[in-house]
Amino acid sequence: MTTNDLRELFLDLNVKFDEELKKYTNTKTGGKADVLAFPDSIEETEKLIKIAKKNNVPLTILGNASNLIVKDGGIRGLVVILQHLDQITVDGTKVTAQAGASLIGTTRVAAKHSLTGMEFASGIPGSIGGAIFMNAGAYGGEIKNIVESVKLLTRDGEYKTYTVDELDFGYRHSRLQSEDDIVVAATFKLEHGDIKKIRERMEELSFLRASKQPLEYPSCGSVFKRPAGHFTGKLVYDSGLQGYTVGGVQVSKKHAGFIVNIGNGTGKDYLDVIHHVQAVVKEKFDVELETEVRIIGED
């Protein structure tokens, strides 16, 4: 399908054509999307998906483009970033957030209503949709422990709901990783708590994160899953890889579990660093480092 064909299909919608994705990814890398959309409502999202389905346009859904690496060749077809779907509501001890709402923002709303259970996520720079997709977690907490249900939109434009038991959560895993359904909202079951203690815990975790993680540089967060019996950062550090650099991408000198863009890094730079780290850790410790970050797009 030509660029002109795509323009005709999506002309009446609020989209961008041939847009550089590096403007929107947390790594500040990534080639062009043929069509890029930021829907303002679930209904608009549904319309975009139906157009793509009807016309066989490839479709890629992103939350807020945080825990992923987009390759330099970009992404063909339609890319939908859900960050404008950010409504958050509270009903008793239940918090419902749309897929594009930030985890940080959702934890703050929960805290404002003296609801506890979500503090662990207060420093995770991702969206609700992405957090469900990969069962995000930190500091001993995981999304699976607080989710009650998730509302999904199928590629056919139909809606369905999964309970937590139906999502097949595991370590950085959910069944959504092998399915095409799109998270549009999630409901969390929390508990009443002491607002002072909730905020103290959130401040404590924010301090820990700022003191240990390289927040001063663009990154995709934690790159590798934690292998059983090991700490990823220690394996990388003990392999002598801290500070290893390709182009503008570097294994962080502050935390060896992070890979950062120190200036004009590319998707290829990221992948070259990742593959080198995997190879060296495998050679030195016979441990396979599996990526946690989502890698998409064309070379």
From Swiss-Prot:
Part of which pathway? Cell wall biogenesis; peptidoglycan biosynthesis
- The Enzyme Commission number assigned here is 1.3.1.98
> What are the required cofactors?
FAD
Q: Where is the FAD-binding PCMH-type domain?
A: 29-193
Reactions catalysed: UDP-N-acetyl-alpha-D-muramate + NADP(+) = UDP-N-acetyl-3-O-(1-carboxyvinyl)-alpha-D-glucosamine + NADPH + H(+)
Q: Which SUPFAM superfamilies match?
A: FAD-binding/transporter-associated domain-like, Uridine diphospho-N-Acetylenolpyruvylglucosamine reductase, MurB, C-terminal domain
Pfam families recorded for this chain? FAD_binding_4, MurB_C
Example GO molecular function: FAD binding
Q: Which UniProt keywords apply?
A: Cell cycle, Cell division, Cell shape, Cell wall biogenesis/degradation, Cytoplasm, FAD, Flavoprotein, NADP, Oxidoreductase, Peptidoglycan synthesis
Q: Which GO terms describe its biological process?
A: cell division; cell wall organization; peptidoglycan biosynthetic process; regulation of cell shape
Compartments where located: Cytoplasm
Q: Name one GO cellular component term.
A: cytosol
The text of the family note is: Belongs to the MurB family.
Q: What is this protein called?
A: UDP-N-acetylenolpyruvoylglucosamine reductase
The organism named in the record is Ligilactobacillus salivarius (strain UCC118) (Lactobacillus salivarius)
